[in-house]
């Protein structure tokens, strides 16, 4: 299998190409049971763990680049713990009940949690897209690639129709609230979002490896 590489393409061009490939490779899921009508076997494609794993690692690489850039530009490194501990963000987290840890692992429950969690992160990625002052190519790459990852994971969930989409009104309200903060707090929130997404994806990566 060819590995995901950005040696030739910019992060945005790579991610746009990746999203196009995912969109054309995976059709809209059919209702449960229709795959086997008329005695035919399912032609619905299945995502290999390797492809999902490589995509997660690609996103983690872009996040790492953004965190490094913010650290160098704004001195927003690990010394912001006091401010971060006082944040009022409700960022997605992975817990034992999500079935993604080795102890109590449940593949279906875990896939649902990862997919829904990434959907919940979308509003925060919109925030990064609006206010991140570094390399915009990285923010766009993270957002586009995360959407591609959601598509991949939906194909692995047995009942994708049960994957709930976050309330857009709630998301819009949160985004408006975040926009009213001063620049220092915006930068602090952005590094927190990046750290939280990185943690979530690290847990997801370990789970994908044992699926």
Swiss-Prot record:
Principal subcellular localization: secreted
InterPro entries, alphabetized: 4_helix_cytokine-like_core, IL-6-like, IL-6/GCSF/MGF, IL6/GCSF/MGF_CS
Disulfide bonds, paired cysteine numbers: 71-77, 100-110
GO BP of this protein: acute-phase response; glucose homeostasis; hepatocyte proliferation; interleukin-6-mediated signaling pathway; liver regeneration; positive regulation of multicellular organismal process; positive regulation of receptor signaling pathway via JAK-STAT; positive regulation of receptor signaling pathway via STAT
Domain of life: Eukaryota
Modified residues annotated as Phosphoserine in this record: 80
Gene Ontology molecular function: cytokine activity; growth factor activity; interleukin-6 receptor binding
Compartments reported by the entry: Secreted
Any one annotated GO CC term: interleukin-6 receptor complex
Family classification: Belongs to the IL-6 superfamily.
Subunit structure and binding partners: Component of a hexamer of two molecules each of IL6, IL6R and IL6ST; first binds to IL6R to associate with the signaling subunit IL6ST. Interacts with IL6R (via the N-terminal ectodomain); this interaction may be affected by IL6R-binding with SORL1, hence decreasing IL6 cis signaling. Interacts with SORL1 (via the N-terminal ectodomain); this interaction leads to IL6 internalization and lysosomal degradation. May form a trimeric complex with the soluble SORL1 ectodomain and soluble IL6R receptor; this interaction might stabilize circulating IL6, hence promoting IL6 trans signaling.
General function of this protein: Cytokine with a wide variety of biological functions in immunity, tissue regeneration, and metabolism. Binds to IL6R, then the complex associates to the signaling subunit IL6ST/gp130 to trigger the intracellular IL6-signaling pathway. The interaction with the membrane-bound IL6R and IL6ST stimulates 'classic signaling', whereas the binding of IL6 and soluble IL6R to IL6ST stimulates 'trans-signaling'. Alternatively, 'cluster signaling' occurs when membrane-bound IL6:IL6R complexes on transmitter cells activate IL6ST receptors on neighboring receiver cells.
Name this polypeptide is given: Interleukin-6
Organism: Lama glama (Llama)
């Amino acid at each position: 299998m060819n590995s995901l590489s950005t040696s030739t393409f910019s992060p945005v061009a790579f991610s746009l190409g990746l999203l196009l490939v995912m969109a054309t490779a995976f059709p809209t899921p059919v209702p449960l049971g229709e795959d086997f009508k008329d005695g035919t076997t399912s032609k619905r494609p299945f995502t290999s763990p390797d492809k999902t794993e490589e995509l997660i690692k690609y996103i983690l690489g872009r996040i790492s680049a953004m965190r490094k850039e913010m650290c160098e530009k704004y001195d927003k490194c690990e010394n912001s713990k006091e401010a971060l501990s006082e944040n009022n963000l409700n960022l997605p987290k992975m817990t034992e009940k999500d079935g993604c840890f080795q102890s109590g692992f449940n593949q279906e429950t875990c896939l649902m949690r990862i997919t829904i969690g990434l959907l919940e992160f979308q509003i925060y990625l919109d925030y990064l897209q609006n206010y991140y002052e570094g390399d915009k190519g990285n923010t766009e790459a993270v957002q586009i690639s995360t959407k591609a990852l959601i598509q991949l994971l939906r194909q692995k969930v047995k009942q994708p129709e049960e994957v709930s989409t976050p309330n857009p009104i709630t998301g819009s309200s949160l985004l408006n609230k975040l926009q009213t903060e001063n620049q220092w707090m915006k930068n602090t929130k952005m590094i927190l979002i990046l750290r939280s997404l990185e943690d979530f994806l690290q847990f997801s990566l370990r789970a994908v490896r044992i699926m």
